Regions:
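Conserved alpha-helical interface elements of two-component signaling phosphotransfer modules
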Residues: 23, 162
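Periplasmic peptidoglycan-binding/tethering modules of Gram-negative envelope proteins
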Residues: 11, 150
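Short hydrophobic beta-strand that contains or immediately precedes a catalytic carboxylate
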Residues: 15-20, 36, 142, 154-159, ...
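Rhodanese-like catalytic fold shared by cysteine-dependent sulfurtransferases
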Residues: 1-10, 26-53, 62-140, 145, ...
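Short cysteine clusters
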Residues: 58, 197
Length: 237
């Protein structure tokens, strides 16, 4: 709701990006939001403004977390709308009449002025968004991988040490979210890395730079909230 308040108080200072499909955007979206489906964001980086607060929003907050992290890597002032439309906006019960149906046009594209290093990062982010891929795995699918061939994957739990100790996915390695960068050398590069947190938000933020670095990193859908909701097993050792 803080993001919504900011958008209402000073709409000209906000650039709201709805990453959902065009069909879902057309059914109703945050007032003022433009539509850039997640898979198309790389092709539309040039429309992102450098002089506004960018708010990325999707369905659950997981793809918007990736998008915001990547935009930050490019120097944009970007944040993710936590929980997305399903778990962030819907619980506020503001009513469908607070949404708008009209499509808001994208601003004109502006080519950035980049040095060699900046161009490398820009190109890497631009290539991050292949069609029909959101880098998220369902809890049941991850459990199948853990049970079938645990040595072929890494499960990375980025919650607090206390919550990890209270119960985690079998074989999961623990590195708290704020410590991942300093300990990235502990994460194997030769196998897929499945990252879990509480609801998928910080996992989304984590996998974005990891994928840019060359990791095959995927976030768990809804994090341990999704895992527990599916009543899947945990261990405490």
């Amino acid at each position: 709701d803080a993001a919504l308040e900011l958008s209402e108080e000073n709409p000209d200072a906000i650039f709201w990006v709805d990453l959902r499909s065009a069909e879902d955007y057309a059914k109703g979206h945050i007032v003022g939001a433009v539509n850039i489906p997640f898979a198309q964001l790389g092709a539309n980086l040039e429309v992102l403004p450098s002089n506004k607060q960018i708010i990325m929003q999707c369905y659950s907050g997981q793809t918007s977390a990736q998008a915001a992290a990547l935009a930050q890597m490019l120097g944009f002032n970007a944040v993710s709308f936590r929980g997305g439309m399903n778990f962030g906006w819907a619980p506020l019960e503001l009513g469908e009449d607070t949404l708008e149906m009209d499509e808001n046009p994208l601003p004109a594209a502006k080519s950035p002025s980049l040095d060699e290093r900046g161009q490398i990062v820009w190109d890497a982010v631009k290539a991050y968004f292949p069609p029909e891929k959101n880098n998220i795995i369902a809890p049941a699918d991850l459990l199948a991988l853990v049970e079938d061939n645990p040595d072929a994957i890494t499960v990375l739990d980025i919650r607090s040490a206390d919550d990890y100790a209270a119960g985690h996915i079998e074989t999961a390695k623990h590195i708290a979210f704020k410590q991942v960068g300093a300990n990235i050398d502990q994460v194997p590069t030769n196998r897929p890395v499945y990252v879990t947190c509480y609801t998928g938000q910080t996992a989304g933020i984590t996998i974005a730079p990891m994928r840019i670095m060359g990791y095959n990193a995927i976030s768990l859908n809804r994090g341990m909230t999704g895992w527990d909701g599916a009543e899947l097993p945990k261990v405490t050792d």
